[in-house]
Amino acid sequence: MQLMVVSGRSGSGKSVALRVLEDLGYYCVDNLPVTLLPQFISTVENNEQDIAVSIDVRNMPSESGVIQKTLNSLDDKLDINVIFIDADDKELVKRYSETRRLHPLSKHDMSLEQAIQSESAIVADIKEHADLVIDTTNKSIHDLSETVRARVLGRESRKLILVFESFGFKHGLPTDADYVFDVRFLPNPHWVPELKPQTGLDQEVKEFLVGHAEVNKLIYQIRNFIETWLPLLEKNNRSYLTVAIGCTGGQHRSVYVAQQLADHFLHDGQQVQIRHRTLESK
């Protein structure tokens, strides 16, 4: 039986994630106090149905470590996965301003900005222990739904899922990455006029990059790093390993390198997901 714990800052998209899990057949409970989790599990464990519960700031224990201790106390047969949904402060302020809803902590005589910052400290403990952090800053409801669906369905094999994503440094670092590799020192197809409008998925750009020894050497070294430590990472009960590859704009070099790595590990029999952040945003 799987137990999905969904948490995150208010306004980030927890309710959307929970609805996706419900659509996938999970028995869902919204805003369950952490202290009631063991009792709740004991009442439904014979149903043989996967469970998802959401925990928000209103039900967070005041003492740090309580959530992790509670999860550790549950039946070893449970496959527990914690998903944390988040967005940057400016985006959360924007969402609350557009919907005109009150933040759960606003009733404590705080401004919206203060409430959002205060919530960050309260939920920091569960975020630190999350198996997956999803940043919804630049995601639509549809994007978030597809991300949750892909990650959850991908976990059915119970193997660690390798997630490769390309990005552009000028658009900011991805917050969900476990490892970030900077490939801005590689030869740049951007400066070749006929290659400038293309991407790292196009054949001419591939031929340009594969023709440079340093590109091939870097891909080999990143691949070797992952292959060396993957067995230990799998033993650490991780659900995902997210490797981000960044170049200046996220169009050529990072796309090519991320795709090459994804293709290699997919061919090697690993569970792989690939995302090109800049290309998907266009």
Swiss-Prot record:
Q: Does the keyword Nucleotide-binding apply?
A: yes
Q: Which domain of life is it from?
A: Bacteria
**Keyword terms of this UniProt record:** ATP-binding, GTP-binding, Nucleotide-binding
* Gene Ontology MF annotations: ATP binding; GTP binding
Q: Where does GTP bind?
A: 56-59
Please give the InterPro entries that the UniProt record associates with this protein: P-loop_NTPase, RapZ-like, RapZ-like_N, RapZ_C
Does the keyword Nucleotide-binding belong to this entry?
Answer: yes
Where ATP binds, per the record, is at 8-15
Q: Name one Pfam family in it.
A: PapZ_C
Disulfide bond positions: none
Looking up NCBIfam families in the UniProt record yields: PRK05416.1 (NF003828)
In the record, the note on similarity to other proteins reads: Belongs to the RapZ-like family.
| PANTHER family in the cross-refs | RNASE ADAPTER PROTEIN RAPZ
What is the stated purpose of this protein? Displays ATPase and GTPase activities.
| HAMAP family referenced in this protein's UniProt entry, alphabetically | RapZ_like (MF_00636)
User: Which protein, by its recorded name, is this?
Assistant: Nucleotide-binding protein PBPRA3258
Tell me which species this is from. Answer: Photobacterium profundum (strain SS9)
Print the organism lineage: Bacteria, Pseudomonadati, Pseudomonadota, Gammaproteobacteria, Vibrionales
